């Protein structure tokens, strides 16, 4: 059993995965001031008993690293995963400086397509892996090299984002894309070995600017798309696909078991379609308000 949680942190991203193995993964960081202590306390409590904690940074935009210095001070990040880059910023913040310290420091690991690492996707020393696999970047790709150059000049960072999945044996596969932009994905989509997923966290918080191309959606065939907390006028609602909109759910927790995933939300009065979920009449109240179960019998 594992837990994926997408935290409601305003116009930004933050997730964690409490693996069934001896692993705990944090993805991005947007510790808005009023929730900073509460979220970090939750992370500290949830990762108790896990020997390995990793932080995956998709890219260094402020809404993905805000509060990173505070988090690092509280949990001491010893496994920092990011793409290899030389991003700079004209206006330095404490969090970007902390990002650079971790990116360039002793405990970084640079991710790329099909990278292998013990306990990330390789078992070892009687400890299971995390089930995390990277589909992108291909570091020799010309469009990606151009994105690296733009970050090195301090112009933009979104297209540094890796694409990766988390899979539970016999259960869920979820995909993250950071803030990859639509026009960039159109250039590189044919170079990526797409896999089918159950849950897609829409890139760029669900914005139209991050819309996943239709032919890519057909290949990954998501059962649910999670749309983030960008302003509603900027969102693409992925018509024709089952969605949960985090502006209306608040936090979302996925309790993953073989052949099914129970879904819990912060706001129990979620007003939109949930008919794609099976109501099993169960409740794990500490995770939130139960809204249904995504059945995965084909696993």
Annotate each PLM feature:
Residues 5-7, 25, 56, 81, ...:
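Hydrophobic/aromatic beta-strand patches that form the interior of the parallel beta-sheet core
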Residues 1-50, 112-196, 253-299:
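Core dinuclear metal-dependent hydrolase active-site scaffold
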Residues 63, 90-92, 105-107, 185-191, ...:
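Internal alpha/beta domain cores that form substrate/cofactor-binding pockets in large enzymes
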Residues 28-30, 57-60, 83-85, 113-115, ...:
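Active-site-proximal beta-strand/loop segments in catalytic clefts of secreted hydrolases
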Residues 62-63, 97-125:
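A metal-dependent hydrolase metal-coordination microenvironment
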Residues 36-39, 67, 92-95, 212-213:
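Residues at alpha-helix caps and immediate loop-helix transition turns in enzyme cores, especially N-
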Residues 23-25, 34-87, 191-207, 218-225:
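Active-site metal-binding motif and surrounding structural segment of the metallo-beta-lactamase
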Residues 34-35, 87-97, 150:
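Short, flexible/disordered intra-domain loops and linkers
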């Amino acid at each position: 059993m594992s837990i994926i949680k997408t935290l409601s942190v305003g116009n930004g991203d933050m997730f964690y995965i409490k693996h069934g193995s001896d692993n705990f993964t944090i993805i991005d960081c947007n510790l808005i001031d009023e929730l900073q202590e509460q979220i970090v306390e939750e992370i500290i409590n949830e990762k108790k008993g896990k020997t390995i904690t990793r932080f995956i940074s998709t890219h260094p935009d402020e809404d993905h690293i805000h509060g990173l210095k505070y988090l690092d001070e509280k949990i001491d990040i010893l496994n920092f995963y990011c793409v290899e880059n030389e991003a700079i910023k004209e206006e330095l913040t404490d969090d970007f400086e902390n990002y650079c310290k971790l990116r360039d420091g002793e405990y970084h690991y640079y991710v790329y397509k099909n990278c292998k690492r013990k306990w990330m996707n390789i078992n070892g020393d009687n400890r299971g892996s995390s089930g995390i696999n990277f589909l992108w970047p291909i570091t020799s790709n010309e469009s990606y090299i151009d994105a690296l150059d733009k970050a090195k000049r301090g112009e933009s960072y979104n297209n540094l984002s890796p694409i990766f999945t988390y899979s539970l044996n016999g259960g869920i596969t979820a995909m993250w894309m950071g803030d990859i932009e639509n026009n960039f994905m159109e250039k590189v989509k044919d170079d990526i070995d797409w896999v089918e997923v159950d849950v897609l966290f829409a890139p760029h918080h669900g914005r139209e600017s991050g819309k996943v191309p239709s032919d890519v959606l057909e290949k990954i065939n998501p059962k649910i798309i999670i749309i983030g907390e960008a302003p509603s006028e900027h969102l693409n609602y992925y018509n024709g696909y089952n969605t949960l909109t985090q502006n209306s759910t608040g936090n979302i927790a996925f309790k993953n078991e073989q052949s099914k995933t129970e879904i819990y939300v912060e706001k129990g009065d979620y007003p939109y379609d949930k008919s794609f979920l099976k109501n099993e009449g169960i409740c794990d109240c500490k995770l939130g308000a139960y809204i249904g179960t995504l059945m995965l019998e084909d696993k």
